[in-house]
Amino acid sequence: MRRLIRIALILLLFPPLLAAVGGWLSGPAFLHPIRRELTPDLIREAETSFLVTGTTCEDFEVQAPDRALLLGWKVRPKNPNGNWVLLFHGVADNRVGVLGHAEFLLRAGYSVVMMDARAHGASGGPMATYGWLERTDTSAIIDALESSEHAKHIFALGESMGAGIVLQSAAADPRIEAVVAEASFANLREAAYDYAGLRKYPWLGKTLFAPGTWTLLYRDQKLAGFPVAEVSPEKAVASRAFPVLLICDEQDVALPCRHSEMIYAAARGPKQLWVVPRAFHTAALGFQPEEFRRRVLSFFAAYSSAAPGQTTSMPRLARGHGSS
């Protein structure tokens, strides 16, 4: 009987212990994601796209407040409408990851800024902080943009990590007047639950594998020196009212729709939540290209007609599912 009890205790305690060790070991990788280099092939892909759309591209260098060098492109269409959209890619990606978004925005007359996030692509920076430092990076990008361009309105669009960054950036900098965010994380703790639950069973990350969540976040906070609890798009949208179009992919197992639903519930400004049927993580544009373009362009057009700084007074938007 005692032997059975010992075996039961071992079986009960082994998974949490293993999770704690795994979380501790995974911490550095969370801050130092795999870097997708900006290869010559990717540059040629972008150049071909810009040639087809008849746009002009120039290199854009911005120094962040911590002196990290951020690299990207400023791209203008043939007939610019005077509005600019800042595009933000996902984790372990680079600026070419949002090329598809840039194409339809440029065709619609929007100029775009495509930057490699810190610790991604060709940009500098010792680590990714998922919005903590990236918020001030975004403000530096806007400062540099406004020093050479006269923007009627500045909007932002991001996916995954980039979605979380744009939501936190817009809360910190009112020059960003409206945001489209696909597959954002609600906060780092919720994202860690999904990570610890093997991106399929978040309840495991909150129960049996909870020690993995705790050790991962604790080690990252010590390594990076910022409060992980404050890296929260959910808190950001509650701190400042601004228009937001949230897009979540129905079959997303990396950042399930509950993240976008939490952000939607917290948002104080005009808001819309679009659940894209059958779509996987950050795949809404691929699954429903026409509807994606229609919704995003309609959203930005609604706020392009407002006087600068007056977008929060526009009508509130609704929650939706699928096409309409």
Question: Which residues does each PLM region occupy?
Answer:
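An N-terminal hydrophobic leader/cap segment in hydrolases
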Residues: 4-63
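The serine-hydrolase catalytic nucleophile loop
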Residues: 91-104, 117
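Alpha/beta-hydrolase active-site loop
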Residues: 97, 128-149
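Conserved alpha/beta-hydrolase
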Residues: 104-124
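Hydrolase active-site cap/lid region
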Residues: 169-226, 235
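Short beta-strand/loop motif that positions the catalytic acidic residue
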Residues: 239-241, 246-248, 252
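Conserved alpha/beta-hydrolase "acid-adjacent" motif
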Residues: 253-259
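Catalytic active-site module of serine/aspartate enzymes centered on a nucleophile-bearing elbow/loop
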Residues: 287-318, 324
